[in-house]
């Protein structure tokens, strides 16, 4: 009936996205340099790309602390200057995927977070905490004024790890209240938020960011899966 009455919504398509705000380079666990990832993003028609290497606090990779972020900023500024001189409409943003530690504290202090263009807060450890503990932990990050995006909120890995016990409804309500953006992680192993929670996020008034969480130049090829979830 909606089709007959021409009331079908205009759904998101790949070409609607102008960039991503969550990706990694050789500064942490990525396999390509800042410039290599930037060029890969440009080839996809992006106008911006967020460099969000892991902060300290994630034991499996070398985290980027405040001092290394200052050095990384110089590299990003140089890349942006190169694009500007060439008249290229593309801009790198400096950020961090900030670890939400087991006690709810963050892998970077506020004085560092406030210098970033974008901060993505994510949980990678202690994922079997009980519902109240992990929800309070996540909410602490959401209410931090320097956190912009909540990354892969439920932590699931399809086929290998179930989602955490997170009270997603409470967290989405907090994101709507604070303006914290909620991620749809396009990695086919994650697709997190899933379609049901993504719809609920929109109903509550949350903003959504679709990111590939790319760790290599071809890691941006999976964006369509995030688009499909959003649709």
Region annotations inferred by a language model:
Residues 97-101:
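Active-site beta-strand->loop->alpha-helix modules in alpha/beta enzyme cores, enriched
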Residues 93:
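General small-molecule cofactor/ligand-binding pocket signal
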Residues 1-25, 31-51, 55-90, 102-231:
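Charged catalytic cores and adjacent phosphate/nucleic-acid-binding surfaces used
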